[in-house]
Amino acid sequence: MLSSTLYAGWLLSLAAPALCVVQEKLSAVPSGWTLIEDASESDTITLSIALARQNLDQLESKLTTLATPGNPEYGKWLDQSDIESLFPTASDDAVLQWLKAAGITQVSRQGSLVNFATTVGTANKLFDTKFSYYRNGASQKLRTTQYSIPDHLTESIDLIAPTVFFGKEQNSALSSHAVKLPALPRRAATNSSCANLITPDCLVEMYNLGDYKPDASSGSRVGFGSFLNESANYADLAAYEQLFNIPPQNFSVELINRGVNDQNWATASLGEANLDVELIVAVSHPLPVVEFITGGSPPFVPNADEPTAADNQNEPYLQYYEYLLSKPNSHLPQVISNSYGDDEQTVPEYYARRVCNLIGLMGLRGITVLESSGDTGIGSACMSNDGTNKPQFTPTFPGTCPFITAVGGTQSYAPEVAWDGSSGGFSNYFSRPWYQSFAVDNYLNNHITKDTKKYYSQYTNFKGRGFPDVSAHSLTPYYEVVLTGKHYKSGGTSAASPVFAGIVGLLNDARLRAGKSTLGFLNPLLYSILAEGFTDITAGSSIGCNGINPQTGKPVPGGGIIPYAHWNATAGWDPVTGLGVPDFMKLKELVLSL
């Protein structure tokens, strides 16, 4: 056996000469997070190594080819095997040897992720770092502010997670503001009723669904993601269907990363997930619906009878999209709605780009990925977290990813106007994509004054990807939903996203029944031919950066104050409502003409 001195020297040799490349580094602990204590070397930690995918420099051009109408290859989506052939994952041989040399044996593969469990002491040496516990309110996470990898692995490894991604998980639902309603009979969509509460009949009228009847056997399916221990409730959906005379249908569930499908009203978190499934069914019934529940715990529990503080540290993004990409197209819905996001600046750029590329690969496979733009308007924190403490607008990720369709929010009824909480603006990570160049230029050149543009330019990146892309009703009046068997009102852009997902499901249904492909990556089509199928929203504006969180109505400690910060809804695309709200019948004619 090695002496303890020799063994310690061997461990240190893992870190010293080989670990010469800092892979990710934060200039400061993100705003709101406080160092509690260094983690004990004996604490367990589970980490994921994201292996690099090759040829991602060709992703955008391939998306352009397959998703641009008029191109001979339009709609000829790829399958799982095609993706692996065009964008292969780097070999894991060198990575596995590196882990084995460190004495790490609990290793598993999930798509392009290498998941492993070890002690904090080993991880500290392996990555030349120091893991510590940080707290933000009730949330405590095991994180570090930088880590390194061996020089010979830089071509194989994209990033290690969770390491420098602190985040501030938030869904976009206003479930905390949900208000109980008395039991009411079903009502037809009339001006008086829809001006008070939004029901399925109101959505039929507002978005011109007409008498369209989808076919459950067409192959069109709709999915939604649930995070933060959320799970939709079967009984509540049945009660919602009964309330609004919707023919009964259920939904299927797939569990990812130790997600839990909790159907107990007393213990489950239901507000966001119920809102998703009820509104999807309201719009797209009887099309099949699937819920993907992604847990926050690691892929496995590392040799422990009970979980430790490190067992609930993973963000869902990587595991969620890796799981979806691991399935063949025949096992996936063709449109997926998500209502979960972080301030873009809290997501390390390496991580954001990795996730965004995974979303782009989903688009190549004919799957439309939607994301609620957020409920914090032009921004809530409005202060840079890079140590400079500069006031700035706060875009929201993943809505800023150019390969996702971000759904903003409207309010009021007949006519709809921009909702002041609808998040939007311009990305600081992602440059403006090709498909929205004309639309954003039109906004910047014709619908914002030169003085305003000059003033805002110190707070935002006008060359960045503009979001949202589209919008749907969010709030005022609220949506009527069922929660724990009772009637509530709720809303937010996380209501807008499932509504839009239901409409995309109907459009896919129409195309599949006509022998055509699904819509897939939607944005190039939205900003060209389909723009005619939207009702432009030209009134209202978003707010923010005033020291108050638009979502909660509460003060933001240390938040930046930017006088006069707002975006106006204007003719054409704008950073509040995007291209506007959908007119299904117009959109159906347009997509069937392709």
From Swiss-Prot:
Residues the record marks as active site: E272 (charge relay system), D276 (charge relay system), S494 (charge relay system)
Function: Secreted tripeptidyl-peptidase which degrades proteins at acidic pHs and is involved in virulence.
UniProt protein name: Tripeptidyl-peptidase sed4
Ranges of residues in domain Peptidase S53: 197-594
A Pfam family reported for this protein in Swiss-Prot or TrEMBL: Pro-kuma_activ
Localization, UniProt: Secreted, Extracellular space
Listed EC numbers: 3.4.14.10
Record key words, sorted: Calcium, Glycoprotein, Hydrolase, Metal-binding, Protease, Secreted, Serine protease, Signal, Virulence, Zymogen
Gene3D superfamilies: Peptidase S8/S53 domain (3.40.50.200)
Cofactor note: Binds 1 Ca(2+) ion per subunit.
Propeptide: 21-187
pH dependence, entry free text: Optimum pH is about 5.
InterPro entries named among the record's database cross-references: Peptidase_S8/S53_dom (IPR000209), Peptidase_S8/S53_dom_sf (IPR036852), Peptidase_S8_Ser-AS (IPR023828), S53_propep (IPR015366), Sedolisin_dom (IPR030400), Tripeptidyl-peptidase_I (IPR050819)
Cofactor(s) named in the record: Ca(2+)
Free-text description of this protein's post-translational modifications in UniProt: N-glycosylated.
Signal peptide location: 1-20
This protein's GO CC annotations: extracellular region
Gene: sed4
Residue positions the entry lists as glycosylated: N191, N229, N250, N568
